[in-house]
């Protein structure tokens, strides 16, 4: 049992690390190649992120569920799919993996391993967009898990890709991602003083979606 849990935790750390390497690395590459064309840079970053998400969920889903995100793990806890110990270990693994992924991306592009971001993302509209993005992410997962489990990977990748464009914050929707991206002063970074507000909005959005879907689409109980 301990070995199985250890594998799940390592899968969460490894998957989150590769996700952040893809997000931050593609952001750096996109900004360098696109020059001053921010729309083109964001499009490239979106495609890379969506593709990485799809691949990583398909890879690690059978091992750990491929949460890569504390709000997804909290939703699973509220749904009684995991327990408190598993939740705590998942969250620790996700944050550690996310930071490692950012450090890797910075290093691969010959940047300081850690550089605090100066990219300000303050304002009520940014917090609202993170609430909406996080609510939508958990909404998509909750709906697919109940009736279309095999569609989770493509649905999540598609949703996050879309949310990059319909939210002014470009849809962080992940506390581990938010914390880690504050350590890269690049295209996808976030100033450290904006992190707390983002994380609170993300958790509120995730919990709200979980509670709503427990009523809207109750899980089928197998006799």
What are the functions of these language-model segments?
Residues 1-223:
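Membrane-interface helix-loop junctions and terminal tails of multi-pass membrane proteins
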């Amino acid at each position: 049992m301990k070995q199985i849990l250890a594998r799940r935790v390592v899968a969460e750390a490894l998957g989150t690390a590769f996700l952040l390497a893809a997000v931050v690395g593609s952001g750096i590459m996109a900004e360098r190649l696109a020059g001053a064309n921010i729309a083109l840079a964001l499009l490239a970053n979106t495609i890379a992120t969506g593709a990485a998400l799809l691949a990583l969920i398909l890879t690690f889903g059978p091992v750990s569920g491929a949460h890569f995100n504390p709000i997804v793990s909290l939703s699973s806890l509220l749904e009684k799919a995991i327990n408190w110990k598993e939740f705590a270990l998942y969250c620790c693994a996700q944050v550690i993996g996310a930071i490692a992924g950012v450090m890797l991306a910075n290093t691969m592009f010959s940047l300081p391993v850690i550089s605090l971001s100066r990219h300000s993302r303050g304002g009520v509209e940014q917090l609202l967009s993170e609430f909406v993005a996080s609510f939508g992410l958990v909404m998509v997962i909750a709906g697919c898990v109940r009736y279309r489990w095999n569609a989770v990977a493509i649905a999540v990748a598609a949703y996050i890709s879309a949310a990059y464009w319909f939210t002014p914050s470009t849809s962080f929707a992940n506390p581990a991602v938010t914390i880690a991206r504050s350590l890269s002063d690049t295209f996808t970074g976030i100033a450290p003083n904006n992190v707390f507000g983002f994380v609170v909005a993300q958790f509120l959005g995730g919990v709200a979606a979980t509670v709503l879907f427990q009523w809207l689409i109750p899980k089928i109980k197998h006799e």
